[in-house]
Amino acid sequence: FWILSLLFFLSCNRNSFSGIIPQTQFTNQEFDRVNTYYIYDYVSKDQILEYSSKQVHKFGRKSIYYFFSHNANIPTDKLKYADSIIDIRKNLKKYRHSLKFVSVKQSSEKMEIIDCLDDPSNLLCNFR
């Protein structure tokens, strides 16, 4: 009985991030990062926070993680070969209507998450 319970628990937790699909990863010369992801509707804010906290981050730098609706069509090549974070933000601005969450890890290692559906005027959500 215990073995079956353990297997059930492990199989449920194994896919706790299955609704988060990595897309583009960009790192500039200073090791600031921008990552984009597609997410399904059932992914919660808590799951995104947990997932974001496990991503690679260089101490003293800034990491921004953009989580778009799974049916968004983000131009990954334009992002992958961008010259700067400013270029990436210009490209992503065109798709802000599909942006669900933004997660930011500041140089202090503090993680912040913004729900863009609840706060669309947030500067990180509208790319201003």
Q: Over which residues does each language-model region extend?
A:
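Sec-dependent signal peptide recognition
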Residues: F1-L6
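C-terminal motif of bacterial Sec signal peptides marking the signal peptidase cleavage site
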Residues: F8-S11
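Bacterial signal peptide processing site
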Residues: N13-N15
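Short, surface-exposed polybasic-aromatic patches that bind anionic ligands, especially phosphate groups
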Residues: I21-V34
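Mature extracytoplasmic domains of secretory-pathway proteins
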Residues: R33, Y37-L99
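C-terminal partner/receptor-binding element of secreted or periplasmic proteins
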Residues: R89-R128
